[in-house]
């Protein structure tokens, strides 16, 4: 399973660990992904999504119905 938010599309990015001696080693910054069940009142069921913390805020702001419509328009099975 990929580490990508279903709502925002955020995925891992790369960067450096930097030591006190300023040595640089490559690392990955992973998104804060959570499996979360959202109640969809219009469908009378729960929908389980893998979303980042920002994705949850987007759903709170815009509503789960709007976000699900966009996911389905993109071709994601929900």
UniProtKB/Swiss-Prot annotation:
The keyword Aminoacyl-tRNA synthetase does not apply. Disulfide bonds: none annotated. One of its GO terms (biological process) is translation. Pfam families: Ribosomal_L28 (PF00830). InterPro entries: Ribosomal_bL28 (IPR026569), Ribosomal_bL28/bL31-like_sf (IPR034704), Ribosomal_bL28_bact-type (IPR001383), Ribosomal_bL28_sf (IPR037147). GO terms for cellular component: cytosolic large ribosomal subunit. Keywords: Ribonucleoprotein, Ribosomal protein. GO terms for molecular function: structural constituent of ribosome. Residues 1-20 are annotated as: Disordered. The keyword Ribosomal protein applies. Belongs to the bacterial ribosomal protein bL28 family. This is Large ribosomal subunit protein bL28. It comes from Stutzerimonas stutzeri (strain A1501) (Pseudomonas stutzeri).
């Amino acid at each position: 399973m990929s580490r990508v938010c279903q709502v925002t599309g955020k995925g891992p990015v790369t960067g450096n660990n930097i030591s006190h001696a300023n040595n640089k080693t490559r690392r990955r910054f992973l998104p804060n992904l959570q499996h979360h069940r959202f109640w969809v009142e219009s469908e009378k069921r729960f929908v389980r999504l893998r979303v980042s913390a920002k994705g949850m805020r987007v759903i709170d702001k815009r509503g789960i119905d709007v976000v699900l419509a966009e996911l389905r328009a993109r071709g994601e099975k929900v």
